[in-house]
Amino acid sequence: MSAYGHGRHEHGQNFLTNHKIINSIIDLVKQTSGPIIEIGPGSGALTHPMAHLGRAITAVEVDAKLAAKITQETSSAAVEVVHDDFLNFRLPATPCVIVGNIPFHLTTAILRKLLHAPAWTDAVLLMQWEVARRRAGVGASTMMTAQWSPWFTFHLGSRVPRSAFRPQPNVDGGILVIRRVGDPKIPIEQRKAFQAMVHTVFTARGRGIGEILRRQGCFHHVQKHNHGCAREESTPRPYLPDCTPTTGSISSR
């Protein structure tokens, strides 16, 4: 069964209709390069303007009728519409850019798929506003963001009013831009160890990073990655290998 459910409304997609917001997303896409993979093109609000960028586009749409409609309406040979559930879609092993107005209730599942996938370089995603804020570390850093911070950067874009969608959701949307780090401070081979350490910091008891990690017997790993600059602080920091303090609280969500 598709993760998007059965009826179109059950797919969770709210169509973007505000041209100002559409143009702002296209402007962000213009700052990237390479082929584009679009998640859930829906009515083609982003697909059609992106077709004028002169780049190959693969639009992955779970709704068969909408996929056929976009195919008929798109004259550009650069646009390929694929009828599939994005969560089942195999991403290319070559550099590409991810773009999408994603179903709010599938945001976490889609982000997990993307963060585990190789090759793509940038992602411009429209999601629920509060989720975009948390993923960007605004107000409170999440464990997911902290666990992937050595390999990706998360930037919060503009807030999108709920009136910009049809049907109108109960909450505002927000733009999140994710970029893959070209020269990460921690090798990807050490991802599991690093993420386990971050999980410990977010879930274990203690007054600060130093105390928590010493109690767990892994403080020397932080010292190694920080080249001796790791130190105990009263507030845990989401990006452990970096000695630059950050502000805000943390959340395990």
UniProtKB/Swiss-Prot annotation:
Keyword Magnesium attributed: no
Annotated Gene Ontology cellular component terms: cytosol
Top EC class for this record: transferase
Gene3D superfamilies in UniProt: Ribosomal RNA adenine dimethylase-like, domain 2, Vaccinia Virus protein VP39
EC assignment: 2.1.1.-
GO molecular function: RNA binding; rRNA (adenine-N6,N6-)-dimethyltransferase activity
Coiled coil location: none
Domain of life according to the entry: Bacteria
GO-annotated biological processes: response to antibiotic
This protein's UniProt keywords: Antibiotic resistance, Methyltransferase, Plasmid, RNA-binding, S-adenosyl-L-methionine, Transferase
Bias (Polar residues) ranges: 244-253
InterPro entries linked to this entry: KsgA/Erm (IPR001737), rRNA_Ade_diMease-like_C (IPR023165), rRNA_Ade_Mease_Trfase_CS (IPR020596), rRNA_Ade_methylase_Trfase_N (IPR020598), SAM-dependent_MTases_sf (IPR029063)
Region named Disordered: 229-253
UniProt binding sites for S-adenosyl-L-methionine: 14, 16, 40, 61, 85, 101
Pfam family of the protein (one): RrnaAD
Record's keyword annotation contains Cell inner membrane: no
Family per similarity comment: Belongs to the class I-like SAM-binding methyltransferase superfamily. rRNA adenine N(6)-methyltransferase family.
NCBIfam families in the cross-refs: Erm23S_rRNA_broad
Function: Involved in erythromycin resistance.
Protein name: rRNA adenine N-6-methyltransferase
